[in-house]
């Protein structure tokens, strides 16, 4: 079994760019940014429970990493960068820290490196279980209307929230809930030490208005690019800013 993905081929000899979306996104999420880098071959992945991979369920990050590795092999991708947003960034960091043959580097936008104590994990598990129950049982428009009121999305205006609620409500609530629980921050290890000891290139992007993740970025041994006029979802709020940062990273 492999993950559903869209592949776009570029020039031979360059590494692939493998894009991983955030929670409730899909393979289209990164394409406005990724298609600027047409010299590189691009793979836009649907994570389990999402898009064309909605029917795929996992028990945790190890399963996600295994599926990602099989997917890369199936597309004959010898060397690559992982570019991930939020959940996709956490998947990228987890997979990279476990060791991936052919990995050139990781670019994470607004991805959490992991909680650092049992109290935080217990609280996060309680919160994610409540959200998962809502995703399973309530209309998605109602759930996402509340989801985008969370503090991390404080920089969004009303119009941006309405657009995101409409876009995300096309998902399957049950499969979103399953993925939310399987990849909760409550079950993700703290990756700070692994990332400090890494052997791969590691860059971090965060929105200028995303105070929570700017603070987290300062804790990581990574070169950080702050995206102007953007909050947590920087590549949606300021794609040109993310494109400029990615171009610098890739020396495009």
Curated annotation (Swiss-Prot):
Top-level lineage group: Bacteria
Signal peptide bounds: none
Alphabetical list of Pfam families matching this protein: Abhydrolase_6 (PF12697)
Keyword terms of this UniProt record: Lyase, Menaquinone biosynthesis
Enzyme class, broadest EC rank: lyase
EC number, UniProt record: 4.2.99.20
Pathway named in the protein's UniProt entry: Quinol/quinone metabolism; 1,4-dihydroxy-2-naphthoate biosynthesis; 1,4-dihydroxy-2-naphthoate from chorismate: step 3/7; Quinol/quinone metabolism; menaquinone biosynthesis
Reaction catalyzed: 5-enolpyruvoyl-6-hydroxy-2-succinyl-cyclohex-3-ene-1-carboxylate = (1R,6R)-6-hydroxy-2-succinyl-cyclohexa-2,4-diene-1-carboxylate + pyruvate
Any single GO BP term: menaquinone biosynthetic process
GO MF, one example: 2-succinyl-6-hydroxy-2,4-cyclohexadiene-1-carboxylate synthase activity
Alphabetical list of InterPro entries matching this protein: AB_hydrolase_1, AB_hydrolase_fold, SHCHC_synthase_MenH
NCBIfam families: menH_SHCHC, PRK11126.1
Oligomer and partners: Monomer.
Protein task: Catalyzes a proton abstraction reaction that results in 2,5-elimination of pyruvate from 2-succinyl-5-enolpyruvyl-6-hydroxy-3-cyclohexene-1-carboxylate (SEPHCHC) and the formation of 2-succinyl-6-hydroxy-2,4-cyclohexadiene-1-carboxylate (SHCHC).
Family in the record: Belongs to the AB hydrolase superfamily. MenH family.
PANTHER family: 2-SUCCINYL-5-ENOLPYRUVYL-6-HYDROXY-3-CYCLOHEXENE-1-CARBOXYLATE SYNTHASE, PROTEIN PHYLLO, CHLOROPLASTIC
Protein name (record): 2-succinyl-6-hydroxy-2,4-cyclohexadiene-1-carboxylate synthase
């Amino acid at each position: 079994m492999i993950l559903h993905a869209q592949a776009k081929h570029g020039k031979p000899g360059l590494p692939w760019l493998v894009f991983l979306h955030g929670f409730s996104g899909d393979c289209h999420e990164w394409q406005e940014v990724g298609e600027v880098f047409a010299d590189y071959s691009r793979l836009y992945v649907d994570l389990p429970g999402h898009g064309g991979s909605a029917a795929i369920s996992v028990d945790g990050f190890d399963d996600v990493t295994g599926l990602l590795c099989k997917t890369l092999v199936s597309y004959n991708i010898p060397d690559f960068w992982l570019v991930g947003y939020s959940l996709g960034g956490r998947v990228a960091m987890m997979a990279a820290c476990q060791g991936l043959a052919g990995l050139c580097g990781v670019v994470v936008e607004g991805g959490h490196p992991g909680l650092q104590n049992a109290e935080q994990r217990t609280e996060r598990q309680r919160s994610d279980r409540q959200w998962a129950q809502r995703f399973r049982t309530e209309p998605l428009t109602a759930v996402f209307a509340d989801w985008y009121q969370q503090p991390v999305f404080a920089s969004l205006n009303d119009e941006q929230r309405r657009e995101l609620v409409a876009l995300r409500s096309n998902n399957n609530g049950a499969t979103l809930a399953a993925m939310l629980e399987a990849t909760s921050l409550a079950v993700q290890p703290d990756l700070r030490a692994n990332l400090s000891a890494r052997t791969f290139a590691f860059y971090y992007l965060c929105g200028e208005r995303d105070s929570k993740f700017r603070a987290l970025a300062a804790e990581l041994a990574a070169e950080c690019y702050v995206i102007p006029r953007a909050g947590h979802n920087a590549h949606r709020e300021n794609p040109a800013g993310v494109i400029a940062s990615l171009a610098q990273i890739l020396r495009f």
